[in-house]
Amino acid sequence: MKKLLREASEYLLSRGIRFPQREAEDILMDLLEISSRSALHQAKLSSEEQSLYWKRLRKRGDRCPTAYIHGKVHFLGVELQVTPQVLIPRQETEIFVEQIIGYLQMHKEKTTFYDVCCGSGCIGLAVRKHCPHVRVTLSDISPEALAIAESNARSNALAVDFLLGDLFDPFSFPADVLVCNPPYLSYKEFFESDPEVRCHEPWKALVGGVSGLEFYHRIATHIHKILVSGGVGWLEIGSTQGEDIKQIFHAKGIRGRVLKDYAQLDRFFFLENQANDAVSSGEVSGFSER
């Protein structure tokens, strides 16, 4: 086993993988369904398992993200199928959604929740799991992504609604709470991104346009149609877009604030639709603001 892992690590290193030993172990642990690294070194592989292992290693060597190789991720107690038709849920998003769940549990009067540009459904399904009093609707423009989200809802026995369409178009009435992860990379940023992103994740879910801000202009223009008066929303944003997005919404008379992640990078934009105290009550711990 040590020889196999050493050869696997050396192969991944030769392909430019940043943490080759850890990833060689992770891929093997997933294949053998082993959760302990100490148990991994005692395992024995059949010739068929070795063949499957090297097949997965070659995929990773081609810079395919590990989550796509595994085919699933865990997100706040929800097991999610992930394929190249959907973005891979990020750890920053998971930490942030914990705070949104806390907000909804404190504000029981908020009973309708929209997850727009839902992808795998990670946000909406986690909200539904932990806030059963909330009616959750997930939407996406991609039929393939929505099919993955629907499959994830079924496999986790979570009752939610689904709508297919572009941004806010499929919704017929406003919600109390909105979360949206729109495409926000510029073309330049996309072509400069890591191969794992550029070559494998769905580019339509990543690229907003020439500036990367195009979807935020659309959201700011139509936010009053998608949120009730007093409603609140969170938008995922690019790491340097905070001030620009704040100005986009300010120009439409919408108050909001930028939330930074633990690395002090712009990560989310919190907004309110004419609520008198929503900004203060919507504070998200663990994220600084400006």
UniProtKB/Swiss-Prot annotation:
Entries under SUPFAM superfamilies matching the protein: S-adenosyl-L-methionine-dependent methyltransferases
UniProt catalytic activity: L-glutaminyl-[peptide chain release factor] + S-adenosyl-L-methionine = N(5)-methyl-L-glutaminyl-[peptide chain release factor] + S-adenosyl-L-homocysteine + H(+)
NCBIfam families listed in its UniProt record: hemK_fam, RF_mod_PrmC
Gene source species: Chlamydia trachomatis serovar D (strain ATCC VR-885 / DSM 19411 / UW-3/Cx)
Annotated binding of S-adenosyl-L-methionine, by residue: 140, 181
Function as written in the Swiss-Prot or TrEMBL entry: Methylates the class 1 translation termination release factors RF1/PrfA and RF2/PrfB on the glutamine residue of the universally conserved GGQ motif.
UniProt KW keywords: Methyltransferase, S-adenosyl-L-methionine, Transferase
Annotated EC: 2.1.1.297
Protein name, entry field: Release factor glutamine methyltransferase
Gene Ontology molecular function: any one: protein-(glutamine-N5) methyltransferase activity
Protein family (similarity comment): Belongs to the protein N5-glutamine methyltransferase family. PrmC subfamily.
CDD domains associated with the record: AdoMet_MTases (cd02440)
